[in-house]
Amino acid sequence: ARTGGGGVMTAVASTRLAAPAAEWSAEVHRDEQALAGLADELRDLYDRSPAATPFQTYEWLRAWWGWYGTPGRLRLATVRCRGRLVAAAPLMAGVRHGFPVLVPLAAGQSDFADFLLDPVHTDGAVRHLTRALLDERGWCAVDLCEVRPGSAAHLVAAQWPRRAWRTPSSVCLELPAAGIDDVLDRLPRRTAGKMRAKLRKIDVRGITVESVPPERASDAVHVLLELHLRQWQGRPVNPEHRRERFRRHLAEAAAGMVRDGRAAVLQYRWDERLVASDLVLIGHRYVGAYLYGAIPDLRDCVDVSLMMLRQDLALARDRNRQGVSLLRGDEPYKLKWRPTPVRNERVILGRTAPAAAFAALARTRARLSDRRHHGRPGGHG
């Protein structure tokens, strides 16, 4: 694909598997019942898609569609080889900046966007997925706002026969799945000493942590959100976190994801009183700290972020994951751990001539947003 923005399109490794054209099939599902009908196959495909993140799990997408989806807008592209599902693009029709586009399901609540792709069938699956999308009428561009390095979406972009654009997007911060002492060793000696003293303070207080079982996960998320809102009382908070649809989506998704080992809801108790809770998403390679809440006065007693980071690191090691992702944002409370920054990209795949104007507008708005947030020119060159 021709790419805007310069640079080489990064992608996960491609493996060629020859299969007669007659053994391939592709379609775009518009019937919202199709999402539920493909549940088992989408779960299986996720397991075979090493680049996918928890935001591409069936449970996350189905719960989101149930509370946010608009009837008639689903565009779920699927590819089969010899009858087996080997690729899927969970998209929906929408309008951005006045342009008709296809966007990922749950984009507003997800830190990463991607397609599902079985690497055994990469070349053929990408080719047929591309053709199925281009044959679908009524849109000028696919707009993927948060694409991780090495994502399947980069493979699709690399083979896209029409114009494709990239622009820098959010920064995500990552730590290796080491013990908390190893993380503290990354800090200046005096700072590390203070953090170790804070850990001893947590332990002396006897704060315990429990991973909630699947049958309690939904209720636990409702409690977590109450703690989250109490924690932010009197300060600006994401308005979506106050809405019933967000609460319902998160609770429903968590129940299925905890059951399948794709998430954990951690509850912290002090003298048997619930004082904090943490929703951690568990991907193929990383665990991601998605949302937490704590009673307001807990910060006066212990370092809450340190307490949760220690447990998230332990969870990553227990699940044999490479590390902990602090997900989007480079806030100071994350940067103090000296994590590795990983830059997402916005990938735009053009279909018709207006895509160029859409991409130019999107890139301009991204630069202006970057200046507002960081007081410097945008990172895009």
Regions inferred by a protein language model and the residue ranges of each:
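ATP-hydrolysis module of ASCE/P-loop NTPase motor domains
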Residues: 134-151
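Short, solvent-exposed beta-strand edge segments and adjacent coil->beta transition regions
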Residues: 110-112, 206
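Short catalytic-loop micro-motif centered on adjacent basic/acidic residues
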Residues: 141-144, 210-211, 323-325
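Active-site/acyl-donor-binding loops of N-acyltransferases
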Residues: 10-32, 149, 153-182, 319-381
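Short, Lys/Arg-enriched N-terminal segments with co-localized hydrophobic residues
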Residues: 1-8
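Aromatic (often tryptophan-rich) hydrophobic motifs at membrane interfaces
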Residues: 79-80, 105, 110, 118, ...
